[in-house]
From Swiss-Prot:
Phosphoserine, modified sites: 81, 303, 330, 354, 357, 431, 644, 646
InterPro entries cross-referenced by the UniProt entry: SE/Ars2 (IPR039727), SERRATE/Ars2_C (IPR007042), SERRATE/Ars2_N (IPR021933)
Source organism: Drosophila simulans (Fruit fly)
Compositional bias ranges of the Basic and acidic residues kind: 8-33, 40-49, 345-366, 393-427
Name by which UniProt lists this protein: Serrate RNA effector molecule homolog
Polar residues composition bias: residue spans: 465-479
Entry-annotated residues carrying Phosphothreonine: 300
Length: 947
């Protein structure tokens, strides 16, 4: 039961409350709070402060609100227009993205623009322009938090701008002021965009005077490296031996993989891996275990085998199930073969002896080895025995006071056996000369200790990667090789220590490395404020990290970026991905997922590309694209010697003529290219024989292949793909490919040709393809000084002067303060001199900021917010929204008008309403219709008439 009648009355349920509230714009935003239904009742209409005048008309202190209270703010007149008594229009479902503007948790609260605040700002700023006669702009909330697309604020159209001007202004003056308004509006948007993004790394890499130079030099270094690799393959005939046809997919993939191996620093020995059958890589790492905190305990290890005894038994004891070290793709049935690899070696050799009859000498060596082991065990000194006993005592104490003491007795017995076997294995590598071994052992374990300590710092994250050299050696699967390496000390005494620890890197060096295969992780969300160094700092904690690639931001994704992290092939990429998903950067979830390998690396294009006429056109386009890209990155710019020839070459390239291909560039791929650009036709023969092209146009002609032209085209296509990352047959560029997981991943090749093709199809294809490649054929020319001046370019000296004036403050007469240093001076000229002498770095920052902003303006393809839909596309009839003079249309269901009480019912949105100025002209005089009247001759003299 309620506490009082008022409380009971307040909580009474109104069935249609939500339906009525949705019609009123001032209640729509706060109709339903986020905090659930408990707090929502306090926000109902009875507590609305704007309803005071309507609810205080009678009754007690609290009365049940009448239905008349829901019809709008203000007191209703007794006798109103019948139009106001009409039932409200049907409530339409709001568009997607409308409604409450809240921060999107997907983007971590990042919204540098606060577009709703900007819309409110511009609405208040233009309040003089948009009075009651003008409806709000269409979809003003398109830039709000509920939408993924940010836009500029809506700009006033000419009709709205006229309302802000004087009545007696001339038409030419109106157009001049409106042009100035549009220019200022554009300047303001560019400046706001620059201020919002100038501190972000991707923006600095594009336009900052220092960072952009470093980035361009880095990219040029990548291109130079790719050019060297291509020229090496071009000279040894690898490029000329392959055709860019989908039927030769294997040969194309081999060429691309060869380039990748060369780019990774591989040798000719590593190229042999391409001849081997691809197989799953062996990963030297632990299997997935429950996450546990490992306490780093520093111990002195006498030999590398100690790492097995002191690091491995603890996980075996603590874990609820035995999970020894082994490769990921190893069989689960052989889980116990790797722990005692040294002790089981005799068994393996005996098994091999039963299979191979040639293994008898190995048995003899094995017997010798056993006798040596017995002698070593008997000749150990007291220090080694005491050390082993102390270590076993410590392990017993740890086992006794272990936190997880609920292990089964069988597991404890097995763990005890493992420790006993490990202590025996610890003594095996020692040679009879103990002094020499001990002297060498004191130097080696230090490196191992450092490795163990660094690994155990982040054991929860790097658990799949923790693996030491001895463990990797036992996992190698080829036990005979291991034993052969261990038997070498008997031949040479000087190499005793080197053979005790088998270096896995040396073993790998003997085999070709598959440098073209990697593992990678895809990051779906990267806030613009996250830098590359922060991502690298996180990834460096995992073994096998190679590089990271970050894409350019997109306005459709609120300037969020995507990223790719590349690791070596033999890592457990799923464990690393799990570790990355448990971390956040700048309160942003990166959304890490495992990036799959490429499914189809060679993809077919239209088969008409093999036709002779199309091939000749493609050669021309490829040569022009190669020239533009080479000139853009200055790949072959240092070789030309004759200034006159280079000048003529530049003029011809600017004019777009292809007559100088091969002359204005020292690129060997473009040499003598003009010989293949001249078309040939047997016109005389066709004329004499009376052959016409009508049959060809109707029936078509078979595909004509010219192998010589195709070989020239393939050379150009591979040059663009390998050097400039341009996939010609896909008419696109693969950006930042040198940082991606697959450096030369995908290529499009000519597909199966059709049987016949018409001349019309060929011409349409050539024209269409040239249109698609227009982005590569046209040069990007920066804007001139005059053009950027119109966009609001800044002057360095002017900005420095403003900086000096801003840091010159007058405290009293002959007393001035410099805020930068806090010192006081007698005059402003002394502060100016002080700033240029003591704060020169601040002045340089101002000059760099000016150059930074001007570089942004010079880019014709600069990133910026798209225009508001209301600015770019105006509705056909603005009077439908109450925007113009005249009468409103009938109130059909999709009607959306201004709130009641703003003017006469059927007039144009308050033209003769109370507290509003009288109606004014809204169009220039030449667009207005002059009212023509007539004079009745029979009417009296004082009658009304029009001029």
């Amino acid at each position: 039961m309620a506490d009082s009648d008022d409380e009971y009355d307040r909580k009474r349920r109104d069935k249609f409350r939500g339906e009525r509230d949705s019609y009123r714009t001032e209640r729509r935003d706060d109709r339903r709070p986020v905090g659930g239904s408990a707090g929502a009742r306090d926000e109902w209409a009875e507590r609305n402060p704007f309803r005071g005048a309507a609810s205080a008309g009678g009754g007690g202190a609290r009365h049940r609100p009448d239905y008349s209270d829901y019809r709008g703010p203000g007191a209703r007149p007794r006798y109103g227009s019948p139009g106001r008594d009409l039932p409200p229009a049907k409530r339409m479902r709001p568009d997607w993205g409308d409604g409450d503007v809240r921060a999107n948790p997907r983007f971590g609260g990042y919204d540098p623009y606060l577009m709703q605040a900007w819309n409110d700002h511009y609405q208040s700023m233009h309040s003089a322009y948009s009075h009651a006669g003008h409806a709000p702009p269409v979809r003003e909330s398109i830039g709000g938090g509920g939408s993924d697309t940010l836009t500029q604020p809506a700009m006033l159209n000419l009709k709205q701008f006229l309302d802000t001007q004087d009545e007696n202004i001339s038409d030419s003056e109106v157009m001049r002021k409106y042009t100035e308004y549009k220019t200022d509006f554009k300047r303001q948007q560019l400046n706001e965009f620059f201020v919002a993004h100038k501190d972000e790394e991707w923006f600095k890499n594009k336009y900052h005077p220092e960072d952009s130079v470093k980035r361009s030099e880095e990219q040029r270094g990548f291109l130079q490296r790719r050019t060297d690799v291509f020229m090496e393959l071009f000279e040894n005939g690898t490029i000329g031996s392959v055709k860019v046809d989908s039927s030769q997919a294997d040969a194309l993939i081999r060429v691309l993989d060869t380039c990748v191996i060369k780019l990774e620093g591989g040798t000719d020995e590593d190229l042999k891996v391409l001849d081997e059958k691809p197989k799953d890589p062996v990963v030297y790492e632990r299997k997935a275990e429950p996450m546990q905190s490992v306490k780093a305990v520093e111990k002195t290890i006498n030999s590398p085998k100690d790492e097995i005894t002191e690091a491995d038994p603890l996980p075996v004891v603590v874990s609820t199930q035995r999970k020894p070290v082994g490769p990921v793709n190893s069989d689960e049935e052989n889980w116990d073969d790797d722990n005692d690899a040294e002790n089981s070696a005799p068994k393996k050799e005996l098994a091999e002896d039963s299979k191979d009859s040639d293994s008898k000498p190995e048995d003899k060596q094995l017997n010798k080895k056993k006798t040596k082991k017995r002698k070593r065990n008997s000749s150990d000194d007291d220090s080694s025995s005491s050390e082993s006993s102390s270590s076993s005592d410590e392990e017993k104490l740890k086992e006794k006071y272990d936190v997880e003491d609920g292990l089964r007795t069988e597991q404890k017995i097995e763990a005890e056996k493992d420790r006993q076997e490990a202590t025996k294995a610890k003594q095996e590598p020692q040679s009879p000369k103990l002094d020499e071994v001990e002297g060498n052992d004191t130097t080696e374990p230090k490196g191992l200790d450092s490795k163990i300590n660094t690994v155990e710092i982040d054991d929860t994250l790097k658990s799949p990667e923790i693996s030491s050299n001895p463990i990797k050696n036992t996992d190698n699967g080829d036990s005979s090789k291991v034993e052969e390496d261990e038997e070498k000390p008997s031949v040479g005494k000087d190499n005793v220590v080197e053979t005790e620890t088998i270096d896995l890197d040396k073993v790998k060096d003997c085999q070709p490395r598959a440098l073209h295969r990697t593992s990678s992780i895809f990051l779906r969300n990267l806030a613009p404020s996250i830098t590359r160094s922060e991502i690298e700092a996180v990834c460096n904690r995992f073994n096998g990290y190679l590089r990271v690639a970050i894409a350019d931001p997109l306005v459709e994704r609120r300037w969020y970026r995507r990223g790719w992290i590349t690791f070596m092939r033999d890592v457990n990429i799923k464990e690393i991905c799990w570790g990355l998903n448990n971390q956040r950067l700048r309160d942003c979830e990166m959304g890490a997922i495992v990036n799959r390998d490429l499914s189809r690396r060679v993809r077919p294009a239209n088969g008409i590309t093999a036709h002779k006429q199309v091939v000749r056109s493609d050669i021309k386009l490829c040569a022009k694209i190669a020239l533009n890209l080479d000139e853009k990155f200055r790949l072959w710019a240092e070789v030309p010697k004759d200034d006159s020839n280079s000048a003529r070459a530049n003029e011809s390239s600017e004019n777009g003529s292809g007559s100088t291909y091969g002359f204005n560039s020292q690129n060997p791929v473009l040499q003598n290219i003009t010989d293949y650009l001249i078309e040939e036709a047997s016109a005389e023969e066709e004329e004499l024989l009376g052959l016409t092209g009508e049959n060809k146009d109707t029936e078509g002609e078979p595909i004509e292949r010219d192998e010589q032209l195709i070989s020239v085209l393939d050379r150009l296509v591979l040059y663009l793909r390998i050097v400039h990352s341009v996939d010609y047959y896909n008419h696109c560029e693969y950006p930042y490919e040198d940082e991606m997981p697959n450096r030369c991943g995908i290529i499009h090749a000519r597909g199966p040709p059709p049987v016949r093709v018409t001349n019309n199809d060929v011409q349409e294809y050539i024209k269409m393809y040239e249109t698609k490649l227009q982005q590569f054929l046209t040069k990007t020319v920066p804007l001139s000084d005059e053009e950027i001046k119109n966009l609001g370019a800044k002057d360095a000296e002017t900005e420095v002067e403003k900086f000096v004036q801003a840091n010159t403050q007058e405290l009293a007469k002959d007393k001035w303060l410099c805020p930068l240093s806090g010192k006081k001076f007698k005059g402003p000229e002394f502060i100016r001199k002080h700033i240029f002498n003591k704060h020169e770095e601040k002045v340089d920052e101002v000059r760099k900021e000016v150059q930074y902003f001007n570089n942004y303006l010079r880019d014709p393809k600069r990133p910026q917010l798209p225009e508001h839909p209301g600015t770019s596309k105006r509705p056909e009839s603005e009077s439908a929204r109450g925007g113009g003079g005249g009468y409103r249309p009938p109130m059909y269901p999709p009607f959306s008008a201004m709130p009641y009480g703003f003017g006469p019912p059927m007039r144009g949105g308050g033209r003769a309403g109370r507290n509003f100025p009288p109606a004014r002209r809204e169009l220039p005089l030449e667009h207005q219709r002059r009212l023509i009247g007539y004079h009745d001759l029979d009417a009296p003299a004082n009658s009304d008439m029009f001029d």
